[in-house]
Amino acid sequence: MNLRHLLATSAATALLSPIAHAAGDMPPAQPPQPAEGADLPTISVTDTRHLPESFDQRYATTQVLTRADLDRLSPSDPSITQALATLPGVTVSQNGGPGSSASVSIRGSSASQVAVFIDGIRIGSPTTGIAPWADLPTEAFERVEVISGPAAASFGANAMGGVVQLFTRRAAGQPNQTTVSFGGGSNKTFDTQLRTSGTVPSTGPLAALGGLTYTLGLHDYNTAGIDATRPVLPYHEDGRNPYHAQDLDARLGYARDNWSISTFALYHRSDLSYDNAGFANRELDHQLTTGLAFHLDVTPDTQFDQSFGYANDRQFLYASDPAIPTDQINSQRISSSTSLTHQAHGFHLFGLPLSGETKVAYDFTREQAFLPVDVPDGVPTRNDSAFSLHQSATLGSVTMFVAGRHEIIAGKAVNTGNAALSWAITPVYTARVSYGNAFRLPSFNDLYYPGYGNPDLSPERSDSVEAALDANTAYGTFSAAIYDTRVSNLIAYNPATFSPINIGRAHIRGIDLSYKGTIGRYTPVSVAIGILNPQDETNDSWLNRRPRQTVSVNVDHTWDEFHLHALSTGASLSYGGTTFDDPANTTYLPSYLSVNLRASYRINAHLTVSATLSNLFDRQYMTAYGYNTLGRTAFGKVSYTF
């Protein structure tokens, strides 16, 4: 069987139970005030993994995609990847059309060097070490938060290039609201959604549950797809590769004066056809992530948080030839997290106001994987226990943040740390310098796969420094960051032993630039630019599939000046620079430019219609050699809310 597909991970079956397990391939003193009249977006990085609640641009480069952003930027994409690609320093490569394996890189990292969480619960396959990006449904999430740079002291393993936090949809205390939508478009694509959310009233037959918030979403996406591969690949097969995905997300929450409890579940099922002539060429995935969280305000300045998580991935690999047996890969992760946070304020030093926050935390994770082959030492299992301490302090216009983490993984100790210092130079400009180290754990495939794995592998390690300048002006927000990362112990394949070993070194330097603001009154604009120098020092080459320049421009306009306030139109431009597909830099991937158009019209308070035209000029390009991307496609949708 083709190793490329056998090593792919899988996805999970189970459903939400507040008392069940709770929890997840390829591929501050006051902050500076804005200038008068400035209309600025709010950045609120949520405290789900023991970061201070004030964690923001003063500690690390942070980008947030709101629900409105997701609706605009990926209206026809079933996965979250298209929206992520609009952020500075984020690049996406994919092996074909919808549903095919995808890889997300932050600041030149590999896909396995990005930590991903859903409502604070880690996701990603223990077998491959990569999140199932193509199977993360855009419609399930309220917002997305991306932290660029190392954050292992707060998030643990794999947070080398950055962290992606996905937060599921939730009710905001409003009465019941239900939305039904139907969409369709090119490649025989059909999209059906139902979403309801609200708060149980404190009167009536359910008064005993008064104040309980709930949300439930159902999503069905079906497409005939495209021919994912080109004839240059040896396993190419003619014909389209259809994809069918079904998603369910649910959440319950209840809050009193000083405590709250919530539980969520996200279930995904998909059926994908892919090219792999003579071997397994159909993949059935089941994925479940579920969690339970409790919060208590011990005092007005002290908070206690406890959460439990469970993630299960199950994947079935089928072949067209019935003589070829079906393979099954099953992995699971159980986790718990406990933290205590205290804020101190009202102090003065040298005549300046002094405040701070201290957080201590303990995390535990247990990972297991059941492979379709015999492993000599039995079922691969890994336990991870971690203690961490976080401290922030603000004196006048200067803020300091330090974090340290001591982790015991499979009996071996790993220590990581982060430090940042920011200075509010003026009410408009804030400067920041930071340092962090991080690590990436070997995947179970790296360690144990028969005929390939090496159980003596050590974690990959990195050290990063960053300098940044942020400006909050009347014209919008500007951010510039320059970073330098050195990676050691990179896991690379050794042809002499037919197994991976720790021999690689990399030096990654880059600049991230971003702008977000409004031109006039009705035209929001966002621009993201990434400049990357990703050097593989071991092979004296470029790290593969890392474009050296990326640009994303998004412009929208509401036509209020013509009294058409219900009409909104927009355009997106995406550019990816040249790169190579292979580590030896022998397979060239040219640059590409893609333009998308969109329009939305609110007919009345209940009914909205929208349309998108993607890849307007029908550019034929590749983000992975031999794999096609979508050509020009059209998609329309009707939504009704009641």
Task: Please describe what each predicted stretch is.
Residues 9, 40, 197-210, 433, ...:
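Conserved C-terminal beta-signal and adjacent last beta-strands/turns
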Residues 26, 356, 393-399, 484-486, ...:
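Gram-negative outer-membrane beta-barrel transporters
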Residues 41-73, 103, 111:
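N-terminal periplasmic "start-of-domain" segments of outer-membrane beta-barrel proteins
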Residues 81-125, 142:
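Extracytoplasmic beta-strand/coil segments of soluble accessory domains associated
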Residues 121-148:
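Short acidic/polar hinge/loop motifs at secondary-structure boundaries
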Residues 350-359, 363-487, 556, 604:
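Structural signature of Gram-negative outer-membrane beta-barrels, strongest in the C-terminal barrel
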